[in-house]
Amino acid sequence: MPRFFIEVQHESDQLACTRFVQIFLATGSHYLTHADWGCLDGEHAAWIIIEADSKEQARLVLPPAYRSQAKIVALNKFKVEQVDGHSNLQAY
């Protein structure tokens, strides 16, 4: 199944940050309650890697208020031969 990296940024002020984290945790969603956070290092964002059929399906994991601002990237892997041979890179 395809894997997707999801990044959702939020405002850095204390109230906005706290509210954002509370909304994620209150959903009870396994994905959201296990998100990685950068807030304590000054990077106000949540990161999640999930399996989904499409970017659109991955976006639905997020609370509705944050879906439109999320960055979603399809993940892939490469074989060494693909990179060493400078051939057309195709994910496997």
Model-derived features with residue positions:
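Conserved, structured core segments of small domains
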Residues: 1-92
